[in-house]
Amino acid sequence: MTGRCPTVAVVGAGMSGMCVAITLLSAGITDVCIYEKADDVGGTWRDNTYPGLTCDVPSRLYQYSFAKNPNWTQMFSRGGEIQDYLRGIAERYGLRHRIRFGATVVSARFDDGRWVLRTDSGTESTVDFLISATGVLHHPRIPPIAGLDDFRGTVFHSARWDHTVPLLGRRIAVIGTGSTGVQLVCGLAGVAGKVTMFQRTAQWVLPWPNPRYSKLARVFHRAFPCLGSLAYKAYSLSFETFAVALSNPGLHRKLVGAVCRASLRRVRDPRLRRALTPDYEPMCKRLVMSGGFYRAIQRDDVELVTAGIDHVEHRGIVTDDGVLHEVDVIVLATGFDSHAFFRPMQLTGRDGIRIDDVWQDGPHAHQTVAIPGFPNFFMMLGPHSPVGNFPLTAVAESQAEHIVQWIKRWRHGEFDTMEPKSAATEAYNTVLRAAMPNTVWTTGCDSWYLNKDGIPEVWPFAPAKHRAMLANLHPEEYDLRRYAAVRATSRPQSA
């Protein structure tokens, strides 16, 4: 049987980009080019290298189901170990020669049935399908703190760690109390002379231990791959149960809250405990996983500051109460612009439609992967994907399989371009909005899950429902078209 040979561009060589590329190659779709702005694969795990960096999803779950690693050294892997895993995946599946490193896609426009891409070097290329896999959290957010440029010490964002800066014995300020801030305090305590954590909002912490895997355990996992499969299924089941607490009020949510509150009681000083107690429900913000934070924050060389930051001067940080906190290094653990998606790429779809105009009221998509008006364009980890405390590898695999099913239909000549119908997309998003009031994200907090109107942009159901949704294609929800220019130039391929 013969079919056409689709050309596919994937933007991003992180976890999701490599996942969709491997899925394409496994389906016999080989004309694939990956554009990567940096000089290595890995995305988040390449960019983030700060002390204490640890994945908050278990190692045996935060991996591709088709490439399980028997050699994880601990339950929650360090960032460097995950980066090594992703580098190994790139080698194992022959991805490196398909990647254009140091190439930032600055624009992509749909023209006569194909996508025309332009990189920052001015190079243009034309493809049948464009897949954005630029990740969720990759644009560092720098807070507008007055006087930051006046500081005579060193300032950097946690995702742009400066490894030339000595840490031993230094006075280090950590601004931010999310997962990164918590991991930094744990990683710097006992190394720095003093760590001062500046807290705007207290976070709920789930005390998940992080035991190391013995050499014997790794030997057994190498000898018996079924053990890795069993562990993967067991962790998947536990996170499905956790999802019930997120999407529905009831016993599961109460149990998670009870564990968080019990852990907080380990803080002995009543004043410190009150300062660390959030005024919202557990899981309303992204839950912080740490078995060591409450121990670290009680050290004599660690201080929690809850007064707001007024400004920065050359010696340090001045808070609203007029106190000067003298420091040598300021680390901004202030998160990312979670709504930027594939920026800085300027996306122009059918009839000159610009993504900035379509998304002026907030990002939205059909079934988390496609957008009306942008034919043959897909997103990995798009709006309302199950992100947060879920294993993104599993989410990426489901989306990659769905995308490849569409491209295989193109290969067999069923259509030239496809895009979701506006009515189908609106109906889908109406269902999502109707489910949001039951979720924990609407219980009264401000987080990066929310758009500018305070509406969560995450998946309001269990991950299993997301997988089921993507398991089948629904052509009736898509506008399938023919383009003479596409059919005239498409190359045949054995299928």
From Swiss-Prot:
Site positions (Transition state stabilizer): 286
The keyword Magnesium appears for this protein: no
Species lineage: Bacteria, Bacillati, Actinomycetota, Actinomycetes, Mycobacteriales
Protein name, UniProt field: Uncharacterized monooxygenase Rv0892
Organism: Mycobacterium tuberculosis (strain ATCC 25618 / H37Rv)
Superkingdom to which the source organism belongs: Bacteria
GO cellular component, one term: peptidoglycan-based cell wall
EC number(s) stated in the UniProt entry for this protein: 1.14.13.-
Keywords: FAD, Flavoprotein, Monooxygenase, NADP, Oxidoreductase
Cofactor(s) listed: FAD
InterPro entries: FAD-bind_Monooxygenase_sf (IPR051209), FAD/NAD-bd_sf (IPR036188), Flavin_mOase-like (IPR020946)
